[in-house]
Amino acid sequence: MLVKAGEENAGLMDIGGGDLPKQQAVLDVRAGSSVLGRARAFGGLHGILPWLYPTIHDVFPFYLAILVQTSGNPQALRLLARSCIEPHAVRTDLERLVWDKPRACSEQSADFPVGRAWSAPNLVRRMCALNQDLVSSARSEEAALVFIARGKAGCRVISWQSIHDCLAEFLHRHALASFHLSD
């Protein structure tokens, strides 16, 4: 089944010029309806999407873990830049995560020990590696941001509404008390 899925993805990626195509693009090619029919066996184009690209459901756990570690403003951290990791000014055993706070027109930072696998800076590195292939497809103003995901609308930074939706799912799944992120 996995080999067939890989072959089907290759055909779809050929039709899409290296990207997962829209349904109409598949139908526009000869034998497109049969390709689409075979794709349906794997959940259709939308079902194949998470096999190829990080989606909001992949990105949200990184966002939440970094948010908890930094105690940052949730809206400001949503717009965290890929260039946010800096060496500490004085100590070599620390590194700094720096982000903009647009409404306050200021910068905020938090320091973390170097080399900790699950520290916020290393989570940023992991997230950037995971979604590196999406950067070239993202909007120019969003390409430099950490929390880019692929969805129905293309490659975008995760939306504030999507974060709230994922948080509600997370709280429900883990039977946690309800709380809301506020800006």
Where on the chain are the PLM-derived regions?
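Extended accessory and catalytic-adjacent subdomains in large enzymes
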Residues: 2-8, 22-183
